[in-house]
From Swiss-Prot:
It comes from the Bacteria. The modification N6-(pyridoxal phosphate)lysine is found at K240. Keywords: Aminotransferase, Pyridoxal phosphate, Transferase. Pyridoxal 5'-phosphate binds at S103, K104, Y128, N178, Y209, S237, V238, S239, R248. Pathway: Amino-acid biosynthesis; L-lysine biosynthesis via DAP pathway; LL-2,6-diaminopimelate from (S)-tetrahydrodipicolinate (aminotransferase route): step 1/1. Its EC number is 2.6.1.83. This is LL-diaminopimelate aminotransferase. Involved in the synthesis of meso-diaminopimelate (m-DAP or DL-DAP), required for both lysine and peptidoglycan biosynthesis. Catalyzes the direct conversion of tetrahydrodipicolinate to LL-diaminopimelate. Homodimer.
Amino acid sequence: MSFVEAKRIRNLPPYLFARIEQLIADKKAQGVDVISLGIGDPDVPTPDHIIEAAEKELKIPANHQYPSSAGMPAYRRAVADWYARRFGVELDPQREVVSLIGSKEGIAHLPWCFVDPGDVVLVPDPGYPVYAGGTILAGGIPHPVPLTAGNGFLPDLAAIPAETARRAKVMFINYPNNPTGAVASKEFFARVVDFAREYGILVCHDAAYSEIAFDGYRPPSFLEVAGAREVGIEFHSVSKTYNMTGWRAGWAAGNAGAVEALGRLKSNLDSGVFQVVQYAAIAALNGPQDGVQSLCEMYRERRDLVVDTLNDLGWRLTRPRATFYIWAPVPAGHDASSFAEMVLEKAGVVITPGTGYGTYGEGYFRISLTLPTPRLVEAMERLRGCLGRVTF
């Protein structure tokens, strides 16, 4: 017996990384030694002091029961304290912070709180696929906002049609940016605040990569800007900063009304974050941060390896100041998909076609730096052998 899927599921595109995982599995089944530069999943272990904190709490029976759907007070306090130390932002942990099962979950659920069927959501293009996916599931209409090299991969707010802006309920932004590696200034965030005020839009800033930065650069928080808390919230997690992608601990912080609405939705959908994981996240946020510095130095070395290799082959790339991604144009004679397919077939190396992140990702590909350095070196040598000199 077959069943008719709901329109919201039929309208949902296949998740990009599920497709990449299938391609890798298919090639491995053929006996190919595949090197994946596709998915951004840290290859370094979670720091010992975080694991030890979890082991301690795991032995306490009370932690095996249902957690608070909003998050333990101690967890929300740790998030607020981290914001104060890192950004100088003072948050009320009871009203302005809610725990998430990783920031992806909150990003996907946010449109359900503020988007009715037919409402518009402004999503960056190229951008993290969950912005559009969550919008579609809520019945909203994703409106792509182009991120182009000519504008530093920042949205041109003035180019968004006024009629579209008036219909928009939510706007997603993401800096440091996945997939482009672009960064945003406080001045840009201030312009976003003004835009959101003018049109009554809720701004959702995805700050997942704020701690993965190089060369002395320290990315700002959207919440540092005057008025940001009136118009928006920020999503973050411990995943990238502390190599905890599998632990699933994140948060949303900022506008109290938006935080409350998201928490209310979640209380009807899930049972919160396992308390042991929350205690591990507290240890991460409150504990020593020298491991984060070492992590960034490792990614900086990998960044330089990839950028130098590609530039030797004919690219003209600048070194991104943040994230663990390299965003690069495809050579002449290819589109994003054909180039990724050719590299996989000839070199056994997986790169992500830019079109996986939206229409404006055409002509680009993304490389992730989250694999052991010796394998990254081998991947670069395979690209040398496969491509030789390239032109554009």
